[in-house]
């Protein structure tokens, strides 16, 4: 509603941080602000007073606010949630690692968030190679141990193990 109002000519939006504010129904500024700053449909027409450096503190602001309120952050929150730039599906991970623009509407760093490619039973070789690389382990795509590792993870996840945080 806020973006539609802005399109219609409104120049001031009242909002909340993480949905906490004066009344219910107010826009979450943690979602509205990056949309206005990062999306071409808005950033060339409106001035927010928020530069790229300030915007990089958005995730920290949102999480810090939840911390002050003794709330768990919303992992699915747009832009700032832990899952906002996360994938575990093999084809998504492969494309994302080759060119993040294929699946990400903005670079996660612009809002102070991180890209996460998780290891799971849905993952392919790219997921595992990326996870191993982050730990300083280089492995070739055709290394037979990689197929063995993927097989073990898939078998274990079928019995209840979870490696998404790995």
Protein language model features and the residues they cover:
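Catalytic cores of alpha/beta
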Residues: 1-10, 27, 31
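Alpha-helical structural signal in soluble globular domains
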Residues: 4-8, 35-39, 64, 68
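A mid-to-C-terminal "edge-of-domain" accessory segment
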Residues: 43-166
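Short, ordered loop/turn segments at secondary-structure junctions
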Residues: 17-19, 144
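Short secondary-structure transition/capping segments
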Residues: 1, 24-28, 153-158
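C-terminal helical cap(s) of enzyme catalytic domains, especially alpha/beta-barrels
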Residues: 21-51
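Hydrophobic residues within beta-strands of alpha/beta enzymes
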Residues: 13-14
């Amino acid at each position: 509603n806020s973006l539609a109002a802005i399109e219609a000519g409104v120049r001031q939006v009242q909002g909340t941080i993480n949905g906490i504010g004066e009344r219910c129904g107010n826009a979450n500024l943690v979602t509205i602000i990056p949309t206005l700053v990062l999306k071409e449909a808005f950033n060339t027409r409106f001035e927010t007073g928020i530069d790229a450096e300030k915007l990089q503190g958005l995730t920290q602001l949102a999480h810090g606010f939840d911390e002050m309120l003794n709330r768990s952050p919303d992992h699915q929150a747009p832009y700032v949630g832990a899952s906002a730039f996360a994938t575990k599906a093999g084809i998504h991970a492969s494309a994302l690692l080759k060119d993040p623009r294929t699946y990400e509407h903005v670079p996660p760093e612009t809002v102070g968030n991180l890209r996460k490619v998780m290891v799971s039973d849905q993952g392919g070789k790219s997921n595992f190679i990326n996870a191993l690389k982050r730990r300083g382990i280089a492995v070739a795509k055709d290394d037979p141990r990689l197929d063995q590792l993927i097989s073990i993870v898939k078998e274990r996840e079928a019995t209840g193990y979870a490696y998404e945080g790995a």
